[in-house]
Amino acid sequence: MKEIPVGLSNEMTIATTPEMGISHLGPGASFYSTPAMVGHIEATALQSLLPFLDPGEQSVGVRINVAHTAPTPIGMKVTVRTTVQEVDGRRCVFAVEVHNEGGLKIGEGSHERRIIDVSRFMGVTKGK
């Protein structure tokens, strides 16, 4: 693993689709869901770490603390921004913000990832 700089940022803009929407409120409730937002936060953080990983390494999410603060209709774009706040060995903590295309902040919080050795990880999880 190469040294990961504190302050490293990454952004990803996503056009929301019906598959990313909530469904439990019934027809007509076409809004971007919290699970979709969390998945996009993880993907954005992961993408920022890829250039710092050695062959055989990967990062996995281990903690997320996010508030989904405003609804966004399906069809709008959202932009996820992750910024490295802290690096401690193989542990990396990100500050996260999510805005919709209207500029409204719809989510914020933190996300933690760990750098793992894939073969070792697979061995540990094999019998479970």
Role assignments for model-derived ranges:
Residues 1-33:
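Catalytic strand-loop segment that frames the active site of acyl-thioester-processing enzymes
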Residues 46-79:
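Hydrophobic beta-strand-centered segment that forms part of the acyl-chain substrate-binding groove
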